Amino acid sequence: MYAVIKTGGKQYRVAAGDKLKVEKLAGEVGSEITLDKVLLVSDGDNTTIGSPLVQGASVQAKVVAHGRGDKVLIFKMRRRKHYRKTQGHRQSFTEIQIEKIAAK
């Protein structure tokens, strides 16, 4: 059984036992969270596609860790004007493990 969920403006295909990194979510490490924005649920034979969400479907997940991604460097430069600017950014993420997919 798998599902397609939406969180943090992105869509993920998940199955029970999967670990994935998503945009930062509120919740302590080890706590259970419920993801209600389920776009598609499939159990192999039957596939339910939401419009836009599947009614009564949810995904249970456990927060494994919080962290920050690799640094991305932004470099701006104006030629012939002696203007150079460097800026860095590290995106925060939450690593979750999918426990259960529930569909009615």
Swiss-Prot record:
It comes from the Bacteria. The keyword RNA-binding applies. Pfam families: Ribosomal_L21p. Keywords: Ribonucleoprotein, Ribosomal protein, RNA-binding, rRNA-binding. Signal peptide: none annotated. GO terms for molecular function: rRNA binding; structural constituent of ribosome. This is Large ribosomal subunit protein bL21. The gene is rplU.
